[in-house]
Amino acid sequence: MASPSARAPRDRLSDLPDFLLGNILSYLPTKEAGCAAGLSRRWRNIFCNVHAISFEEREGERAKDWDTFYFEAEERKSCSGVILDDVCSALLCRRRTAGAHVPLRSFRFAFDDCHGWNAVHVDQWLTYVLRTNRHHELHLDLCFWLGRICQRRKRDRYGGEEEEEVGSGTDNSDAEEERRKWRAWSYVLPRGLFSCTAIRTLRISNCRMNLPRTVELPFLETLSITAPRRDGGRSVQRLISSCPGLVDLTLQSIDRLSSVSVLDKRLRRFALRCCHNLRSVHVDASELRSLDYSGAAPAESLLSLHGAVGIPSSTVNFCQAPSSESERDRFTRFMEKISAARHLHLHHQHLPYSCFEGFPSFSSLTRLALQGALLIPGVMRRILEQAPNLEILTLLMEFSTVPERLAAPDESSFSVPCLRSRVKEINMVHYQGDALQRMMARLLFRNALVLERMCVVLVKGPFALQYRLKKEIEGSMVAGHVEKVFL
């Protein structure tokens, strides 16, 4: 007869070495990884081997602090106490073990709104992280304000919205500097950060760079700059030029940037979002794999992609509707520039239907995602006709008003080549079952002859309504052996 000890289950997970357990916990949210210390004595110090620390506030969490905290609190201290305590506790836990912990590879925090009282804490965090990771790769994501990227309409620190602040796009405008004096305090990054050769990823948002005379980031591969405070366009360009190994660049909401050149390195991914004062961009696109653009319909001279032979993946979001014929022509010419894409994600919520009259041909397109209020059938048919090799169609639908006197087109009019012989997967997200959505589902599924998989994400509602919508969609399908997913 076996002894009780022999029958007891063995904890094989706890038998793993500390560094391996820490690596496993690093893929969990930091708070959950810290809770593992309560499992047993074996796990008490495992958190010291977690190589990723990430904490963030919710967007809008600090919106009412001026009313409820600064005027009423008797003790004047930071109101971001939770995130400050969390980050400090996580870093102190590592310091208690002296040299026994593994190097920190990833450090991320996001303040909804960072006050000047937080500066001393952030200085301590970055000093520790940079000092203890001089010879190992390091990924930093430092966000000091959460809000809309587009500066045309952005949330102010009182929780409302403020109008667009239009800058000159230069470095030397005294009048522009005067207009910025009302701005709230901005955290200034430590200069030692720009000489830390261990950094592989650097994402900074709503802070001041204040670059030193010498910037040395030889191994930096991913750089993201969002709304730098008081740093001009020349500082942004100098930082980009000081990163010889850069392959992934994101520029967001930089209102003082008028031109940028990335011809001395070959990017694989480039994102340009809401830099409304930008006049010219020159990029070596010979190895570019992904392009992400957000802004107004760009002029022909704005984006120069040198050596581009076809960018496989593109994401396009126009934050301002084209209001004239010339702007609609610019939209068409821009879409022609990326017409060799195999994957396209188009945000069309600000685009009038007239923009699609000259929609170019995307002969290589296999994946298409359309995000915004659902397009009327005529426009949808026009887009599908221009993508003869489309295989996956995704509709990320947002709430919209159903057009009055909406006439249902003949189902045979949607018998376009891609639906008849190419489209294998259709996804409809945020399906609420209004007249336009039901019409579109019927037109698509009754003409998708080779469909293999469909997924419909229903909005929350009564079970009876969801069941009826599900049965209606299933009744529209003509293809056999389709994998059906309803969420």
Question: What does each of the following model-derived ranges do?
Answer:
Residues 2-255, 261, ...:
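Leucine-rich repeat
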Residues 50, 104, 135-137, 199, ...:
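Conserved hydrophobic position(s) of the canonical leucine-rich repeat
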Residues 192, 213-216, 236-239, 260, ...:
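C-terminal per-repeat helix/turn "cap" of leucine-rich repeat
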Residues 270-338:
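Acidic, glycine-rich loop-and-beta core segments that form the ion-binding/anion-interacting portion
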Residues 337-369:
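Oxyanion-binding "anion nests"
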Residues 463-487:
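C-terminal helix/juxtamembrane-tail motif
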